[in-house]
C-alpha cells in the first residue's frame, strides 16, 4: 500500500549500494521528473565505448518492468502480491513500462546497435505461462514496440526454464532471445526451439556454462560449439555464447575457443 504507482518510473536493481537514481532523501515530497530523469553519464558510456572500439557491436541494456517489480518488493513478496494485489501490480508494471521504454529509446538514439531487455526471472522457476501472459507479456510488448520504432533490434534475456513459453516470448515482438539455458540448467533444446520460433527470432546462447565450459576440454567445447552453430544459424541466425553467467573458474582457453570456432564457422569460403 505504501507504493504509489505515480511515484515510480525506473529502478536499477544493481544501483551502487542499493541507492536508486534519482537519489532522494525525504526532504521534500518526491515527484520524479520524467522529462529529465537520466544522468548524462549513462549515455557518455556509450560514446566512450564507440570511440575506443569502433569495430564492436555495442548493445544497451534495460531492466524489464517485471524485473523491477520483483526488485521493488523482494522476490517472495512480489510473487505473493501478484495473488493478493494483482491490479496494484499491474499499475506499477505500467509505470515501469514508461521508464524502461524511455531509457531504451534514449540508448537507441545515442547509437547502440541493439537493446537487451533483462528479464531474468520471467521463466518457469518463478511464474507460470499464464502469469507470464498477465504480468510480463503486455508490458514487454509495449517496451519492445516503442524501442523498435527507433530502428534498433530488441532482444530479451530470460534465464532458466523457458521451454514452455518461447512462443509467448516471440509474441512480444522481440528480434531475439538470449541465454536459452539447455537441460539440466534450463529446458531449451536448440533443435526444438529452432523448429518452433527459429524463423522469427535469432538465438544467443544455449552453451551449458557449467557442464560444458567449466568441465570439458577445449576440444569438447569446440565440438559442442560447432554443433550449435550448425543447428542455430539457419533462418534468423545464431550468436554463439554461453547460456548464462560464466563461472570465474572457467578456463580462459575454453572461452577463447568459442571465438575461434565462431570466426572459423563464419569465414567466407575461399
Indicate where each model-derived feature is located.
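Active-site loop segments of alpha/beta catalytic cores
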Residues: 2-270
Amino acid at each position: 500500500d505504501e507504493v504509489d504507482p505515480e511515484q515510480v518510473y525506473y529502478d536499477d536493481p544493481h544501483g551502487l549500494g542499493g541507492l536508486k537514481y534519482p537519489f532522494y532523501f525525504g526532504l521534500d515530497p518526491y515527484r520524479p521528473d520524467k522529462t529529465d530523469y537520466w544522468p548524462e553519464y549513462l549515455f557518455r558510456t556509450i560514446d566512450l565505448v564507440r570511440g575506443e572500439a569502433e569495430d564492436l557491436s555495442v548493445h544497451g541494456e534495460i531492466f524489464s518492468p517485471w524485473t523491477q517489480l520483483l526488485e521493488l518488493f523482494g522476490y517472495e513478496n512480489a510473487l505473493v502480491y501478484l495473488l493478493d494485489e494483482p491490479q496494484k501490480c499491474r499499475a506499477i508494471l505500467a509505470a515501469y513500462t514508461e521508464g524502461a521504454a524511455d531509457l531504451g529509446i534514449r540508448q537507441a538514439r545515442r547509437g547502440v546497435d541493439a537493446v537487451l531487455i533483462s528479464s531474468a526471472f520471467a521463466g518457469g522457476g518463478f511464474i507460470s505461462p499464464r502469469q507470464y501472459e498477465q504480468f510480463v507479456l503486455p508490458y514487454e510488448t509495449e517496451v519492445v514496440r516503442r524501442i523498435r520504432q527507433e530502428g534498433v533490434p530488441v532482444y530479451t534475456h530470460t534465464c532458466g526454464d523457458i521451454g514452455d513459453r518461447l512462443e509467448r516470448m516471440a509474441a512480444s515482438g522481440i528480434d531475439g532471445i538470449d541465454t536459452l539455458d539447455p537441460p539440466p540448467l534450463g529446458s531449451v533444446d536448440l533443435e526444438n526451439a529452432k523448429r518452433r520460433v527459429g524463423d522469427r527470432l535469432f538465438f544467443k546462447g544455449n552453451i551449458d556454462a557449467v557442464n560444458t565450459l567449466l568441465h570439458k576440454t577445449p576440444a569438447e567445447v569446440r565440438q559442442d560449439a560447432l554443433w550449435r552453430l550448425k543447428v542455430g544459424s539457419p533462418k534468423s541466425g545464431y550468436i554463439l555464447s554461453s547460456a548464462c553467467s560464466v563461472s570465474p573458474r572457467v578456463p580462459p582457453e575454453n572461452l577463447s575457443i568459442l571465438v575461434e570456432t565462431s570466426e572459423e564457422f563464419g569465414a567466407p569460403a575461399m
